Amino acid sequence: MTESVLDYMTRLGRAARQASRVIARASTAQKNRALQAAADALDAARAELAAANEQDLAAGRANGLEPALLDRLALTPARIDGMITGLRQVASLPDPVGAIRDMSYRPSGIQVGKMRVPLGVIGIIYESRPNVTIDAASLCLKSGNATILRGGSEAIHSNRAIATCIQRGLAEAGLPAAVVQVVETTDREAVGALISMPEFVDVIVPRGGRGLIERISRDARVPVIKHLDGICHVYVAEHADLDKGWRVAFNAKTYRYGICGAMETLLVDQRVAEGFLPEMARRFQEKGVELRGCERTRALIEAKPASEDDWHTEYLDAILSIRVVDGLDQAIEHINHYGSHHTDSIITEHQGQARQFMAEVDSASVMLNTPTCFADGFEYGLGAEIGISTDKLHARGPVGLEGLTCEKYVVIGDGQLRGQESC
């Protein structure tokens, strides 16, 4: 009898839960050995990876996949190099598991502190890019978690080949293969099953388009770490250094259009708009960026009219909306109303205004005189990230190794009794 999707996912979940207990107590040396061995296995399996990836690319071309998606799907030699390097870099990162902090004596004589421990089993749901398999697996492994990876159907052969290499590394380190499992069915029911198994899965991390993330957020019976959009703003304030503003805003938009930290809306204080916008527009237009502006913006530069929808839009493209605002309060109001609570930056030399902006803008990252594209785990010193969270529970901002752990209280006594004096 053919195994149903639900039975298959239950089997994966049960195996992951059992494996999570093993990886949670694995030593740092053992986890690092698995990561290094997985890197060696990837290096030795380049031909296998290329053949599996070509199967996915051929199917994608036959199914009319867009060129941009085919590019994201491709495992070029350089990308395989990057995956190998990524595994070795994660192996070199400090291990957060087992760290104890804030240990202190209480009046009763007991000691109380906090220990960092793995979350348990993490389900990762993602689209297109097979290198996410390595990113997710390596971070979960190093942080002492088991993981179930459900990639897009368009990358199924690539993901299987990558998972095989990871499991070779696990075996070499004496760890169970179920520490990292790839869902091998392309049936969409697998996603519904994965997000509905709180007895086996502790948290879900979705990485993909808005539709995928909205569905998972709505239907999941398991906690979700996510962000929906990256509608990031740069506000050029009254006391801005204009040259700094031109450089920061240009980099925030043009570093890479397709990242969630790219600036999508530029806000400019009315007191500097006339001196700032013409030169800013010239630089963007030379780069081929389409500008959409409010009425006050279009009185100063050539731009298409911005609609209400533009303020809500994550373009992920060479398009920028611009609004002239009355001042700091209106800029903060605009960001908190239209933004996605991801990353927002102020350009100013006025420390009081900078502090107000950072205190009142309700985003995972707030910046001063810094391009929003710096919102990245590597740039923050995390070494790597599994994604960026705009939630306030459990993690917020780039989620690295520490974000894949939680804390439990550690209490040490010597026979003290509550309600009685220590003997």
UniProtKB/Swiss-Prot annotation:
Q: In which pathway does it act?
A: Amino-acid biosynthesis; L-proline biosynthesis; L-glutamate 5-semialdehyde from L-glutamate: step 2/2
Localization recorded for this chain is: Cytoplasm
Return any one Pfam family short name.
Aldedh
Which keywords does UniProt give here?
Amino-acid biosynthesis, Cytoplasm, NADP, Oxidoreductase, Proline biosynthesis
**Single GO cellular component term:** cytoplasm
Under catalytic activity, the entry for this protein gives: L-glutamate 5-semialdehyde + phosphate + NADP(+) = L-glutamyl 5-phosphate + NADPH + H(+)
Task: Give the GO biological process terms.
Answer: L-proline biosynthetic process
- List the GO molecular function terms: glutamate-5-semialdehyde dehydrogenase activity; NADP binding
EC nos: 1.2.1.41
Q: Where are the transmembrane segments?
A: none
User: Does the keyword Cytoplasm belong to this entry?
Assistant: yes
User: Keyword Disulfide bond: yes or no?
Assistant: no
Q: What highest taxon heads this organism's lineage?
A: Bacteria
Q: Which Gene3D superfamilies match?
A: Aldehyde Dehydrogenase, Chain A, domain 1 (3.40.605.10), Aldehyde Dehydrogenase, Chain A, domain 2 (3.40.309.10)
Where is it mostly found?
cytoplasm
* General function of this protein: Catalyzes the NADPH-dependent reduction of L-glutamate 5-phosphate into L-glutamate 5-semialdehyde and phosphate. The product spontaneously undergoes cyclization to form 1-pyrroline-5-carboxylate.
Matching entries from NCBIfam families are given as: PRK00197.1 (NF001221), proA (TIGR00407)
User: What PANTHER family does the annotation carry?
Assistant: DELTA-1-PYRROLINE-5-CARBOXYLATE SYNTHASE, GLUTAMATE SEMIALDEHYDE DEHYDROGENASE
Record family assignment: Belongs to the gamma-glutamyl phosphate reductase family.
The entry's protein name is: Gamma-glutamyl phosphate reductase
Question: Which gene produces this protein?
Answer: proA
